Amino acid sequence: LGHIPVGVEGSETFVEIARKSTGCDVYHMDFINLDLPQMEYDGIFANAALFHTPRQEINRVMRELNDSLKKRGVLFCSNPRGDNQEGFSGERYGFYYDWNTWKEICLNTGFEEIKHFYRPDGIPEEERPWLASVWRK
């Protein structure tokens, strides 16, 4: 397809696994310590990842992701559907956004909405646990 994927992973072990199994460049970093080149990427795919970013850091992280996209670049993200509550599941932190809050964050950090939807298909929308959204720089 002509894509040249680059991975970002917080676990050094998973970085090595991803590099070996894909042959792609995979950076060892997390959203808190992003160090991506500016205006480099046509698209970012952040599936089940951004909700692990602490609420007080999400605006900065989203601006940095926006900065790393080329003009008119696209961001896809998917987060568990929630009511703006935060907490831990074992040792894993999560902030569970509702649509209005997530939309406000994305708009305030320079993104334009393309579409949003709840997934997976095949069950009533109000029971779908994942909020997916697509944004343009």
Regions found by a protein language model. Give the residues of each.
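Class I SAM-dependent methyltransferase SAM/SAH-binding core
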Residues: 1-33
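Acceptor-substrate binding/catalytic loop of class I
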Residues: 53, 85-101
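Conserved S-adenosyl-L-methionine
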Residues: 111-122
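Conserved beta-strand signature within the Rossmann-like core of class I S-adenosyl-L-methionine
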Residues: 72-79
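A short acidic, Gly/Pro-enriched loop at the edge of an enzyme's catalytic core
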Residues: 32-44
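Core SAM-dependent methyltransferase catalytic element
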Residues: 121-137
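A short SAM/SAH-binding and catalytic strip from SAM-dependent methyltransferases
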Residues: 42-57
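A short glycine-rich, Lys/Arg-flanked "PGG" loop and its adjoining helix->strand segment in the class I
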Residues: 59-71
